[in-house]
């Protein structure tokens, strides 16, 4: 059983530091890839956060790791750029990731997903183009991001989709843009947004 052993200012600092570390990791990753001129797209929870921020700052959620999508031919350049910046490359069960310390948790990592790879038995990952440019960084178009979230459809993906539904970013008109089973997954969330 977990008990409160960390309290007071130490607890506040720990909670704030966790969020700030993720934000710094995202900014550092983007700066490295931009400087190296390696094509990429921020995906996952941070891409959702960027889209949600366009509508309601209070609705944003953070996520533990940073996910980027790159083309397989650019992976060597990503490895070179990230390791030159002091990050440690690791490949765990086929997933390339970068951590700040060799013994760091995969939760504290930058995960690199490859265009064309099939994740969790779904569709192949999309290309990074067409892209959406958010001034300082690149992400995928909203339609592509929604498709990726419908494809993965883990609980956290469902929550991200529900956040976008609750803000009106996604509505019933989106369902016809996707083939089954993705359309059915979206309709499931639209029909019962409270679970």
Tell me the role of every PLM-derived stretch.
Residues 1-195:
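Compositionally biased terminal segments of proteins
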């Amino acid at each position: 059983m977990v008990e409160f052993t960390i309290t007071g200012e130490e607890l506040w600092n720990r909670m704030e530091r966790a969020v700030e570390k993720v934000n710094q990791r995202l900014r550092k990753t983007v700066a490295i890839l931009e400087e190296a001129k390696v094509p990429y797209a921020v995906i996952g929870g941070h891409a959702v956060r960027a889209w949600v921020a366009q509508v309601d700052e209070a609705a944003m959620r953070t996520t533990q790791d940073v996910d980027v999508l790159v083309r397989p031919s650019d992976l060597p350049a990503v490895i070179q750029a990230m390791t030159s910046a002091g990050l440690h490359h690791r490949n765990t069960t086929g997933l390339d990731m970068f951590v700040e310390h060799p013994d760091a948790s995969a939760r504290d990592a930058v995960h690199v997903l490859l265009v064309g790879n099939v994740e969790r038995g779904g569709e192949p990952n999309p290309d990074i183009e067409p892209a959406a440019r958010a001034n300082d960084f690149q992400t995928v178009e909203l339609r592509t991001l929604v498709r990726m979230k419908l494809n993965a459809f883990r609980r956290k993906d469902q929550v991200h989709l529900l956040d976008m539904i609750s803000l009106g970013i996604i509505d019933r008109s989106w369902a016809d843009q996707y083939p089954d089973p993705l359309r059915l997954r979206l309709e499931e969330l639209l029909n019962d947004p409270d679970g």
